[in-house]
């Protein structure tokens, strides 16, 4: 079973192809939800040396970044591709 962890946002790399799918309205909606209810769904990241690569959860990551959070909850997964 995977263990939920807090990852430093500054160490999470978002691949260029993922960044093109960013919707600012969705980020705002998720940020509002996080303010009201906390982060409900962890993101998925994989390790890449000293950093982590985002596998799933772009809008949640950007919402936490927008809110000024230093960390985000997620699961570390074993994945070669994203």
Regions found by a protein language model. Give the residues of each.
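Short, charged/polar connector segments at secondary-structure boundaries
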Residues: 1-78
């Amino acid at each position: 079973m995977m263990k939920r962890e807090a990852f430093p946002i500054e160490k999470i790399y978002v691949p260029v192809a993922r960044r093109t799918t960013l919707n600012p309205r969705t980020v705002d909606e998720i940020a509002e939800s996080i303010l009201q209810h906390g982060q409900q769904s962890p993101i998925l990241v994989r390790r890449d040396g000293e950093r982590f690569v985002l596998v799933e959860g772009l809008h949640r990551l950007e919402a936490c970044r927008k809110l000024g959070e230093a960390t985000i909850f997620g699961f570390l997964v074993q994945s070669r591709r994203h």
